[in-house]
């Protein structure tokens, strides 16, 4: 099952699937159905909370358009975690998840749900998913809405990346001492596993707005820079009092309002109905007095701007 877990890939599901179908047919293979997994965590690590949500929504819409065009059923899998930054798949928030990602056939329940929320809540969540994911649904976006989401992805990403690049050394150092709950390759060493902050050229070339495209292209970083796995990254951010859900979100909302007014915000909330609940949850772990002990003054100003504007 192909796993798509970067924003440029999520925005290109249509071309990925159509090429796969056409080449499979040319090779004589019959395709009766397609399963594809949409990663929800790593797009957030790369581009921030809102871009990850909107990227998955565009991917779902494109996948179901492929189903319609080729007559081949598509059964998407949503790979998500329990914290809002990673998808907020919990018993308390499952209605928002299913409303935000209509048409998914499978939702992953990761180990954090079992260990942080307990067996009984995990069992109830599994039963709800078993019942409600059986409903066959489709999902579509108009070209206008899809283009709007693409612009929002660029807006929120530029603020998120510009801040994250300034704190990566601190976050990597903290993440390296986060106690692991399962065996994983380390971020560095002869056998390692790390996340590259993506080159933004693939995203930038999809953006029609010239100013936005240039702003994304200006966020250049040194080759070889590494970031921890998303689990360690989120743990590090929460540990120093700044849930990553806030990074870039407040400034992104403000620019969206400046450009599109109240209707622009209403459109965002319409398609991301859980955003208020996600930010409310993350806000319980916000501790700006603690953050100030770890991060430079410039970053603190950006974070405070995000918090105020949320």
Question: Which sequence ranges carry the predicted segments?
Answer:
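Active-site-facing alpha/beta catalytic cores
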Residues: 1, 5-13, 305-306, 310
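Core alpha/beta catalytic barrel or barrel-like domain that forms the active/cofactor pocket
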Residues: 1-5, 28-49, 70-86, 103-116
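A short acidic (Asp/Glu
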Residues: 9-16, 45-50, 85-92, 117-120
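Well-ordered, non-membrane alpha-helical segments in soluble/globular domains
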Residues: 13-22, 50-66, 91-95, 126, ...
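Acidic (Asp/Glu)-rich catalytic clusters
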Residues: 20-31, 68, 97-102
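Surface-exposed, charged/polar loop-rich segments
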Residues: 43-56, 61-69, 76, 133-145, ...
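Short glycine/threonine-rich loop-to-helix capping motif typified by GTGT followed
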Residues: 49-52, 87-94, 221-224, 259-265
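Acidic, glycine-enriched catalytic cores built around paired aspartates
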Residues: 105-106, 114-310
């Amino acid at each position: 099952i192909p796993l798509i877990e970067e924003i440029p890939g999520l925005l290109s599901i249509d071309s990925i699937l159509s090429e796969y179908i056409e080449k499979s047919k040319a090779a004589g293979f019959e395709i009766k159905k397609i399963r594809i997994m949409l990663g929800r965590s790593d797009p957030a690590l790369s581009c921030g909370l809102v871009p990850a949500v909107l990227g998955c929504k565009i991917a779902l819409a494109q996948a179901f358009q492929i189903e319609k065009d080729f007559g081949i059923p598509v059964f998407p899998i949503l790979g998500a975690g329990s914290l809002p930054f990673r998808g907020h798949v919990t018993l308390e928030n499952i209605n928002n998840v299913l409303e935000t990602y209509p048409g998914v056939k499978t939702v992953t329940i990761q180990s954090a749900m079992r260990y942080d929320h307990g067996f009984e809540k995990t069992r109830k969540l599994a039963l709800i998913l078993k019942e409600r994911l059986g409903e066959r649904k489709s999902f579509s976006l108009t070209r206008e809405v899809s283009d709007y989401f693409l612009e929002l992805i660029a807006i929120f990403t530029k603020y998120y990346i510009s801040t994250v690049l300034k704190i990566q050394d601190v976050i990597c150092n903290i993440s390296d001492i986060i106690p692991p709950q399962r065996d994983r390759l380390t971020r560095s060493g002869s056998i390692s596993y790390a996340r590259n902050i993506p080159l933004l050229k693939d995203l930038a070339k999809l953006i029609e707005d010239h100013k936005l495209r240039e702003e994304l292209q200006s966020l250049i970083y040194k080759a070889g820079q590494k970031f921890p796995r998303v689990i360690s990254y989120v743990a590090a951010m929460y540990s120093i009092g700044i849930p990553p859900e806030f990074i870039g979100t407040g400034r992104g909302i403000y620019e969206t309002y400046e450009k599109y007014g109240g209707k622009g915000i209403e459109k965002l909330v319409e398609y991301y109905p859980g955003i208020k609940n996600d930010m409310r949850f993350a806000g319980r772990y916000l501790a700006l007095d603690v953050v100030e002990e770890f991060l430079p003054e410039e970053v603190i100003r950006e974070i405070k701007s995000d918090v105020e504007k949320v």
